[in-house]
UniProtKB/Swiss-Prot annotation:
Disulfide bonds: none annotated. The gene is fabZ. HAMAP family: FabZ. GO terms for biological process: fatty acid biosynthetic process; lipid A biosynthetic process. It comes from Bordetella parapertussis (strain 12822 / ATCC BAA-587 / NCTC 13253). GO terms for molecular function: (3R)-hydroxyacyl-[acyl-carrier-protein] dehydratase activity. CDD domains: FabZ. This is 3-hydroxyacyl-[acyl-carrier-protein] dehydratase FabZ. The lineage of its organism: Bacteria, Pseudomonadati, Pseudomonadota, Betaproteobacteria, Burkholderiales. It comes from the Bacteria. Keywords: Cytoplasm, Lipid A biosynthesis, Lipid biosynthesis, Lipid metabolism, Lyase.
């Protein structure tokens, strides 16, 4: 299953400048996702990180992995939504083993590959990898909490 930016925005509450997924190339709901972030010099974080040598902050690469994980966790087997995004919050609550191997710079296309390790109604665990031109630039284990906003 693929998603364009409209499908992504239908599923994620994030908006500019915090929406860090541009396209979904492959998605197996509840199992895995491959998504793309096109890194442009126009990203607001490049203004201060760093003006003379722009590098995408590692924490935003991890956030992009978390957003990718939310996309496939909230999509059912038929491509529909499992929950009402307006009534559900998805929080990044843990990061283990994060490693940043190479800098991500303007002009790079960040390929995000995330696999589910454990999914439940309240806590989910994932293994995420980020690649540029087939080379590993970052990896991390993620833990996310799902909460109803009506509680």
């Amino acid at each position: 299953m693929e998603l364009d930016i409209k499908g992504i925005m239908d599923r994620l509450p994030h908006r500019y400048p915090m929406l860090l997924i541009d396209r979904v190339l492959e998605m197996v709901p509840g199992k895995s996702i491959v998504a793309i972030k096109n890194v442009s010099i126009n990203e607001p974080f490049f203004t201060g990180h760093f003006p003379h040598h722009p590098v995408m902050p590692g924490v935003l690469i991890v956030e992009a992995m978390a957003q990718a994980s939310a996309l496939f966790s909230f999509t059912d087997e038929n491509g529909g939504l499992k929950c009402d995004g307006a009534k559900t919050a998805y929080y990044l609550v843990g990061i283990d083993g994060a490693r940043f191997r190479k800098p991500v710079v303007p002009g790079d296309q960040l390929r995000l590959e995330v696999e589910a390790e454990r999914l439940s109604c309240t806590i989910c665990k994932y293994q995420g990898r980020a690649l540029v031109d087939g080379q590993l630039v970052a990896e991390a284990k993620l833990m996310c909490a799902i909460r109803s906003l009506e509680e």
